[in-house]
Amino acid sequence: EISACLVGSEMCIRDSLLSVRATVGMVFQNPDNQIVANVVEDDVAFAPENLGVPPQEIRARVNAALKQVGMYDFRLHAPHLLSGGQKQRVAIAGVIAMRPKCIVLDEPTAMLDPSGRREVIDTATKLCREQGITVVLITHHMEECIGADRVIVLSNGAVVADGAPKQVFSQVDLLKKEGLTAPVTVRLLHALREHGMDVPIDALTVSDCADAVAAALKR
């Protein structure tokens, strides 16, 4: 049983768990399991209300959070009328309104189409890069991790790979062993290398991959 945990540089004990929970927000795989209100802005207000935030500040937080995820114009809409990607962005807004230091996204795109997946990943990236919020993304879609600062591969609770995306995704055989598929760019470069073409295997983006192949063809 864990009786204490480390959050940032501070040691927290069981009696201070409430304050710890306020620093971490969670976004679930299915937004329908997280959305509780009949109006978008009411749903986003739910978490800060439970944290005892004053009403005037709640209003400011709700508006700011919805603008951050691009859903402010839908603030008076019914959540059940939104697309999957829009619902997930509302769920993220609800977490942002808590003003957490860290957001954990648990397979947030598993139930979304490609367009919805892109919406969610772009939102998460923006929160990290522009707002300075730590984002922990749990996913089986390796393409979603290309822009990450750090990638950790887990197998049965143990860390089997840990490093920058280029370092981790270049280990194609390891990923395959763990039931994961490397980004399509890496798979293409890996196949070309196996057929004798001298190309790097760590060009993750489509443009970098195209440049690497073009350079190899000129040699």
Spans of model-derived segments:
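Conserved ABC ATPase "signature" region
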Residues: 56-74
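Conserved ABC ATPase signature
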Residues: 78-82, 86
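Conserved catalytic motifs of ABC-family nucleotide-binding domains
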Residues: 99
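Catalytic Walker B motif of ABC-type/P-loop ATPase nucleotide-binding domains
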Residues: 103-106
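ABC ATPase "signature
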Residues: 162-163
